[in-house]
């Protein structure tokens, strides 16, 4: 999956916006911030947007 940067928003497709749901898991050493892509990103919640590695799938083909 390729990523495209439009302004401050990184999308998986040049015509789409992808947002993530935030999940914070606290492990003994340090908190780990996890996020997964979801479609239907609106202008009002676009502050939660995928980073490039999230768009790229991060481990899945």
From Swiss-Prot:
GO MF annotation list: toxin activity
Keyword check for Amino-acid biosynthesis: no
Note: Is classified as a P-type cytotoxin, since a proline residue stands at position 28 (Pro-31 in standard classification).
Function: Shows no cytotoxicity and does not inhibit the binding of alpha-bungarotoxin to nicotinic acetylcholine receptors of muscle and alpha-7/CHRNA7 types. However, it potentiates the binding of alpha-bungarotoxin to the acetylcholine-binding protein from Lymnaea stagnalis.
Compartments it resides in: Secreted
Disulfide bond entries: 3-19, 12-37, 41-49, 50-55
Name by which UniProt lists this protein: Nakoroxin
Tissue expression from the record: Expressed by the venom gland.
Record GO cellular component, one term: extracellular region
Pfam families from the UniProt entry: Toxin_cobra-type (PF21947)
Keywords carried by this UniProt record: Disulfide bond, Secreted, Toxin
Organism this protein belongs to: Naja kaouthia (Monocled cobra)
Signal peptide extent: none
Record family assignment: Belongs to the three-finger toxin family. Short-chain subfamily.
């Amino acid at each position: 999956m390729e990523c495209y940067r439009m302004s401050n928003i990184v999308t998986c497709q040049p015509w789409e916006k992808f947002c993530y749901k935030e999940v914070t898991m606290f492990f003994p050493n340090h908190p780990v911030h996890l996020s997964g892509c979801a479609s239907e990103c609106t202008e009002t919640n676009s502050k939660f947007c995928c980073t490039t590695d999230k768009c790229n799938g991060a481990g899945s083909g």
